[in-house]
A protein has these predicted regions:
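N-terminal regions that are enriched for targeting/export leaders
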Residues: 11-42
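Glycine-rich nucleotide/cofactor/substrate-binding loop typically near the N-terminus or early
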Residues: 78-148, 154-159, 163
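Catalytic or ion-translocation cores adjacent to nucleophile or general acid/base/metal-coordination motifs
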Residues: 66-107, 230-262, 359-385
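Primary mode marks residue(s) on the alpha4-beta5-alpha5 output face of response regulator receiver
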Residues: 221, 229-237, 242-331
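Conserved small/polar residues in nucleotide/adenosyl-binding loops
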Residues: 503-507
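Active-site periphery "cap/insert" segments of enzyme catalytic domains
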Residues: 129-133, 138-239
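A conserved active-site cap/scaffold subdomain adjacent to cofactor or substrate pockets
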Residues: 286-389
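C-terminal catalytic subdomain
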Residues: 352-477, 481
């Protein structure tokens, strides 16, 4: 039993003890869970329903927020079991010291913030097959017939088994050769735990990628089934397990679309929380270079659209604002966002922001020309050919992007972050609209803003800003190759361009 002094010592600490002293938190304008956090954790440990792999910032505030909303409404009595596959420091430095609680900070465009403690993340486990304690616990969880879903935010790279030459990465090859009991990668760990479930109960389960990539469920399914097939070839698993994983009536891989801008934790937010009396809010940098804090700051708007294929039942996700629909509609929403309503605008601002010396995306919207550029990309050029998914209005979505989301001055999002890996994005973000115009009109000659965005990217690749000063390009796997193509171009000298950007198809 907690005594008076135990609670007083933990006043305004993000901990189970700390949030029991509700008065000070309320005075600071911070909402606390209305449900019994300890009971939810206890019940979830006994009967897990939802496991999540990849427990960083977007998971904590968005997916954790969904589970928190269901608990607040009383339509669920379970939280999420959190599993980290990559950066184990996150468990030791952010989850355990704060009793798995999250300080969720929503940054409103008017400068106000909404602050809420989330108690929906009930347990944090490291996906370490070499740790007997962690591995045993994970096996127990997956052996429970009541487990309904396992979801992922591990980034698109987390699903990749092979390199650009089509050969298995060395760490994946080791996972294939060593079998389920020595799994290390996210895909091998998941496949191994599905094998544990198969051996224990053969119960159905939904395996749901929530990463921001096209056809994410297909990517996840292909990687899991390939890992299982390789294990089968090596004699680690039988044909019956291969059949289990390949049967979507038993193991489904729903597609999804996720959208919520979640920048790295801002020092200004940490300072404001500490000034309000909350202790120990400083961000930390882990050994894997993850920049993370006890709090997560993010924008208010958020979208999660999921294909409704859950063979073992599911939480009532729609009660927390999740769009539950069919695969075709998920694909349409994703294409609407990626090819027209958000990502093409972001990329244009990213490359021009780097060239023009901006450090905040929102500040670019104060520039008349840049604001007009993205309005033309989204409205004048995008809307005539946009894919309409029906469940979300493209016009309302792009209006929110242009008038609320991008101009939000309190979102610490940078052009440099968004410019990362642009070579991997520019084709889908602009190419689909160009193709739509060619299909509609026979050519894309009437487009002005989209070609200007692509030209801006080529100019960005020269690595010289508008003042003639060198700057560092954001990380990009194609950067060196692209710079070679542009190596002869001199800024201000039109004659130095000799057609090096023209693509010649191999004969």
């Amino acid at each position: 039993t907690l005594g008076f002094y135990d609670i007083m010592e933990d006043i305004m600490k993000l901990s189970i003890n700390g949030i029991k002293n509700t008065t000070d938190w309320e005075k600071a304008g911070i909402k606390l869970p209305s449900y019994d956090v300890e009971k939810v954790a206890e019940d979830t440990k006994k009967s897990p329903v939802w496991v999540h792999f990849g427990i960083g910032n977007i998971f904590r505030i968005f997916i954790g927020g969904i589970a928190d909303s269901l608990l607040e409404q009383g339509v669920s009595d379970k939280g999420i079991t959190c599993v980290e596959t990559f950066d184990f420091d996150v468990v030791d430095k952010i989850y355990k010291p704060f009793d798995n609680l999250v300080m969720a900070v929503t940054l409103k465009e008017d400068g106000n913030t909404e602050k809420k403690v989330l108690g929906s993340l009930t347990e944090a486990i490291k996906a370490q097959s070499y740790s007997q304690k962690e591995w045993k616990r994970l096996k127990e969880i997956f052996a429970d017939p009541g487990l309904q879903m396992v979801s992922f935010t591990i980034t698109e790279k987390g699903y990749a088994l092979k390199d650009s030459k089509g050969e298995f990465f060395s760490f994946i090859r080791e996972d294939i050769d060593n079998g389920p009991e020595k799994a290390t990668s996210a895909m091998a760990v998941t496949a191994a735990l599905l094998y544990e479930r198969f051996k224990a109960c053969k119960a159905p389960i939904a395996v749901v990628s929530m990463d921001n990539c096209s056809h994410n469920g297909e990517k996840l399914r292909n990687s899991i089934t390939e890992m299982v097939t390789e294990w089968n070839k090596n004699g680690f698993v039988g044909n019956d397990f291969v059949d289990y994983v390949n049967n979507e009536e038993l193991v489904s891989f729903p597609w999804s679309m996720i959208d919520k801008i979640t920048p790295r934790p801002a020092d200004s937010v940490a300072k404001a929380l500490e000034e309000a009396g909350v202790e120990d809010m400083s961000p930390v940098i882990t050994s894997k270079k993850t920049y993370i804090a006890p709090f997560v700051n993010a924008e208010g708007p958020q979208y999660l659209v999921i294909e409704d294929r859950f063979p073992n039942g599911r939480p009532q996700l729609e009660k927390a604002g999740v769009y539950m629909t069919d695969r075709q509609t998920v694909n349409k929403v994703e294409r609407m966002k990626v090819t027209t309503c958000l990502n093409p605008l972001h990329t244009a601002l990213a490359v021009y922001g780097c060239l023009l010396g901006y450090n905040l995306i929102a500040d670019e919207m104060k520039d008349k020309e840049l604001s007009e550029l993205v309005r033309r990309i989204g409205l004048s050029e995008g809307m005539p050919v946009v894919i309409n998914p029906e469940i979300i209005s493209p016009q309302k979505f792009v209006d929110e992007v242009l008038n609320v989301r991008i101009p939000n001055p309190f979102m610490p999002d940078t052009p440099q972050r968004i410019a990362t890996d642009t070579s991997q994005k520019v084709g889908i973000r602009y190419g689909e609209t160009i193709k739509s115009y060619v299909a509609k009109d026979g050519s894309a000659k009437e487009l002005i803003a989209i070609p200007l965005a692509i030209a801006g990217w080529c100019r960005y690749l020269l690595g010289i800003d508008d003042n003639g000063e060198s700057f560092e390009l954001s990380p990009d796997p194609m950067a060196d190759e692209l710079k070679k193509h542009l190596s002869g171009i001199k800024i201000g000298d039109i004659s130095s361009y000799t057609g090096c950007l023209l693509y010649t198809s191999p004969s």
